[in-house]
Amino acid sequence: MTERVDPKKLIKGGLHDWEVVIGMEIHAQVTSRSKLFSGASTEFGGEPNDHVSLVDAAMPGMLPVINEECVAQAVRTGLGLKAQINLRSVFDRKNYFYPDLPQGYQISQYKDPIVGEGEVLVDLPEGESITVGIERLHLEQDAGKSLHDQDPTKSFVDLNRSGVALMEIVSRPDLRSSEEARAYVTKLRTILRYLGTCDGDMEKGSLRADVNVSVRRPGEPLGTRCEIKNVNSIRFIGQAIETEARRQIAILEDGGKIDQETRLYDPGKGETRSMRSKEEAHDYRYFPDPDLLPLEFDQAYVDALASGLPELPDAKKARFIKDFGLSAYDAGVLVAERASADYFEAVARGRDGKAAANWVINELFGRLNKEGRSIEDTPVSAEQLGTIVDLIGDGVISGKIAKDLFEIVWSEGGDPRAIVEARGMKQVTDTGAIEAAVDAIIAANPDKVEQAKAKPTLLGWFVGQTMKATGGKANPAAVNALLKDKLGIE
């Protein structure tokens, strides 16, 4: 691809400007009821070693059997990434020793992965976007978990996670800033959640990132990269990249060289520290797993899975812009979570799309964020919010009263129309009543009347006073028209 250098994204060192080059390896836990090669449960949060089969524990004579649902989920993900689906792939043994890896090797895919090259379109602030290349996606087993805080002199191993299916999604080194990296992971997580192939819960370890970072002077060859392992939040991904890039720049500007190694990010200390020298592929002694035949399926299998895919974020965003007249920004906010997009569509159906988006984004999302709640936990249903939008559009209530009504529905529930009737919240459309209020305000403020003729912006003050006098129930358009006429403002 053509190299791009964005001056805004260069990092200023003590001597030079530097470009950071980032590639990502995302480990996404496959959404399935059982593990990749055994029937043990993948449920999170069980007692230690409660979800372990003889295969997971690597007991002698136990053979792996592929879980077809995990294969289907990997293919769906590949299709969602616009990637090449390989009809033949091979499982390999990746040999290394860890206490929580009972086999002494991990079953993974090396030369022949299930998914080949693809791409992800990533939206950035200020209307920019970049395309990040996907190098490959392969299936592999997760390892268990070592526990070091249970006893002062012993470590324990929990194999509940051992053998759980992971998709390792490897990007090309197309990212050039921590902001781009965060946006990429956010978009990838959104796609996975839409597809239903990974829940993307980083707190539970369902999505983990290995971040490859190198720096170079603009236009120069790629520098030596360091891999930061198992970063478990999008915020920490950004911090780890910034910290590691600064570390490398300081070494290079001091005349040193970067050692290729695996590092760990410590958010408490705000630093990366060395874990081990970075392994190369030959260190793992990959070879095809003799217990597993090559994985083969036909194009009809892929086509059947493709026909069942949901509408993905990019397509949904384009449709929202086209069908509802939304801005790219508003459409992007609404499609960021599938549940949010579904909620908006339910509100907007048969209504003014822009008005619906305004209420969903500004009022509903604003309140949800304030209270730390998710869209799934909203006390205001799409039907209730749609009714509020209808009441405004039909002129039954004003925008100000609508906000009061929203608060009532949020706190107490109920049918918005019935609440408006019961509490006398309908806006005043009787021009006689509005005119009486306007006349009273004009009569009480002769000095303001004179000022308004010279300074038309004072109209807003008169509108505010009229709305106050009518308890916010006066029709704003009628108030504006009457005041302009009586004050002689064009």
Swiss-Prot record:
<dbReference type="GO" id="GO:0070681">
    <property type="term" value="P:glutaminyl-tRNAGln biosynthesis via transamidation"/>
</dbReference>
<dbReference type="InterPro" id="IPR004413">
    <property type="entry name" value="GatB"/>
</dbReference>
<dbReference type="GO" id="GO:0006412">
    <property type="term" value="P:translation"/>
</dbReference>
<dbReference type="InterPro" id="IPR018027">
    <property type="entry name" value="Asn/Gln_amidotransferase"/>
</dbReference>
<keyword id="KW-0648">Protein biosynthesis</keyword>
<protein>
    <recommendedName>
        <fullName>Aspartyl/glutamyl-tRNA(Asn/Gln) amidotransferase subunit B</fullName>
        <ecNumber>6.3.5.-</ecNumber>
    </recommendedName>
</protein>
<dbReference type="GO" id="GO:0005524">
    <property type="term" value="F:ATP binding"/>
</dbReference>
<keyword id="KW-0547">Nucleotide-binding</keyword>
<dbReference type="InterPro" id="IPR014746">
    <property type="entry name" value="Gln_synth/guanido_kin_cat_dom"/>
</dbReference>
<dbReference type="InterPro" id="IPR023168">
    <property type="entry name" value="GatB_Yqey_C_2"/>
</dbReference>
<dbReference type="InterPro" id="IPR042114">
    <property type="entry name" value="GatB_C_1"/>
</dbReference>
<comment type="similarity">
    <text>Belongs to the GatB/GatE family. GatB subfamily.</text>
</comment>
<dbReference type="InterPro" id="IPR017958">
    <property type="entry name" value="Gln-tRNA_amidoTrfase_suB_CS"/>
</dbReference>
<dbReference type="GO" id="GO:0050567">
    <property type="term" value="F:glutaminyl-tRNA synthase (glutamine-hydrolyzing) activity"/>
</dbReference>
<dbReference type="InterPro" id="IPR006075">
    <property type="entry name" value="Asn/Gln-tRNA_Trfase_suB/E_cat"/>
</dbReference>
<dbReference type="InterPro" id="IPR003789">
    <property type="entry name" value="Asn/Gln_tRNA_amidoTrase-B-like"/>
</dbReference>
<dbReference type="InterPro" id="IPR017959">
    <property type="entry name" value="Asn/Gln-tRNA_amidoTrfase_suB/E"/>
</dbReference>
<dbReference type="Pfam" id="PF02934">
    <property type="entry name" value="GatB_N"/>
</dbReference>
<comment type="subunit">
    <text>Heterotrimer of A, B and C subunits.</text>
</comment>
<keyword id="KW-0067">ATP-binding</keyword>
<keyword id="KW-0436">Ligase</keyword>
<dbReference type="Pfam" id="PF02637">
    <property type="entry name" value="GatB_Yqey"/>
</dbReference>
<dbReference type="GO" id="GO:0050566">
    <property type="term" value="F:asparaginyl-tRNA synthase (glutamine-hydrolyzing) activity"/>
</dbReference>
<comment type="function">
    <text>Allows the formation of correctly charged Asn-tRNA(Asn) or Gln-tRNA(Gln) through the transamidation of misacylated Asp-tRNA(Asn) or Glu-tRNA(Gln) in organisms which lack either or both of asparaginyl-tRNA or glutaminyl-tRNA synthetases. The reaction takes place in the presence of glutamine and ATP through an activated phospho-Asp-tRNA(Asn) or phospho-Glu-tRNA(Gln).</text>
</comment>
